[in-house]
Amino acid sequence: LFQEEIFMPMIEAKVTVNLPEEKRNVLKAELGKAITIIGKPESYLMINLIDKQDLYFAGKKLEKGAYVEVKVLGKADHSKTNEMTAHLCDVFESILGIPQDAVYISYWGTDCWGWNGSNF
């Protein structure tokens, strides 16, 4: 069995911009580095990148924007999520040109994660 502290983080990013394969690969690598900030290893990280999404904030469509969900088994330390948020905002701005004030991130912890016919 895997230890709860390390198993199965998931990052799902919905972005308004197109993600060509080369940018997907760079973003995937950076997300792999980012997850280590909250003590999770890339070797258990699942990533879902969804491009060309319509995102709205305050009733207005975002030309460039991102909504990112970080899901973990257990809980992530709040001080570490602050650090990860700063890092992710830098990543989405530098790779995709999405302004940091248009990157929205939520963190979700669960005590139950299913895989391979059973739950952890």
Q: Residue spans of the language-model regions?
A:
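Short, Lys/Arg-enriched N-terminal segments with co-localized hydrophobic residues
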Residues: 1-7
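Interaction-mediating elements
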Residues: 8-120
